Amino acid sequence: MTTPPFLAGERLTASALNHMYAAADASNRSVTAATMTPISSQYAIDAFDAAVGTTYRLSCWGVGAQGSSAQTLSFRANTIAGSGLNLVTIANSFCATTAQFRWFARMTTTCAATGSGGTITGFLEGLVIQTGVTRPSIQFNSEWTGSAINTATNWGIEIDCEWGSVTGTPSITCNGTLFERLG
């Protein structure tokens, strides 16, 4: 069980608050390519910011349109300075051809070891649902452990996506991104 950042009755100080923060933006980013491309905004993490147990969470959401020829859609968590983490591919049946859809993706990663031999573990999750349809959403998730990251240099995180093919002109747009550092 983890200890909460503040205990009941504890005095809240500026030095305690600097361990948790968030940043958000509403920049639109679109992906129409069949190659991994950032769909979320990219957030930098300073060298030596991560300690063992430091957790970062990146959420993004938006809309899209399936092409006139149904295509698969893949998401991937990425460490920018490191490498792409586990890839999740959604079958092309997630949405009818030419139909609109809504989507959400969240990456959560925790530092397991620091320095030039640092490692992170984490999870990528999300959902996609066709607009105006009552059928269940398509959920996706992926986990990684022991991914190498040098926490002694600047690094960062983003969520990428790609289409299986550009045939039929599919598109996906991010309408907002939220980055959080959680203690």
Where are the regions a protein language model picked out?
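Surface-exposed molecular-recognition determinants
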Residues: 9-10, 17-183
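C-terminal trimerization/auto-chaperone modules of long, extracellular attachment fibers and adhesins
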Residues: 2-6, 11
